[in-house]
Regions:
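Active-site acidic-Proline motif in GNAT/NAT acetyltransferases
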Residues: 59
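Hot-dog-fold acyl-thioester-processing enzymes
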Residues: 1-49, 108-110, 114-121
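Short alpha-helix capping/helix-loop boundary micro-motifs
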Residues: 52-56
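HotDog/MaoC-like acyl-thioester-processing domains
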Residues: 62-63, 72-121
């Protein structure tokens, strides 16, 4: 099956909580972006997100982090695709403008989602 990966810097403007924490919806939004590319590559259409299942928030995401978000198609129906998602922190912002590459990336969020695409013509 197909996998697509995006990397994204988390801007400080997205921090909503003490310790520069970013809400979990940020990663879910990135899952939508990477799912869109999956649909374009497979079907030539952006598709629509139908549902999420088994969303797990495993580690914090903070402003200044760099996330690697991957979508892997695990099932293809006639008009639906089941996709496994992971959001991994690969760099962590530190004080000021400093940041460091993590020796061991941290899995922050996992989920399974279903997208639907138009019927083939």
């Amino acid at each position: 099956m197909i996998s697509v990966t995006h990397r994204r810097y988390v801007p400080y403007s997205h921090a909503h909580y003490a310790g520069h924490l970013v809400d979990g919806a940020y990663s879910l939004g990135l899952f939508g972006d990477v799912a869109t590319e999956v649909c374009i590559r497979l079907d030539g259409d952006e598709g629509l997100f139908a549902s999420y299942s088994d969303v797990q928030f495993k580690a914090p995401v903070r402003a200044g982090d760099v996330l690697e978000v991957t979508a892997t198609v695990t099932r293809m129906g006639t008009r639906s695709r089941t996709i496994d998602f992971t959001s991994v922190v690969v760099c962590r912002g530190t004080d000021g403008s400093a940041a460091s590459v993590l020796d061991e990336p941290s899995v922050a969020v996992t989920a399974t989602g279903t997208v639907v695409v138009p019927p083939r013509r």
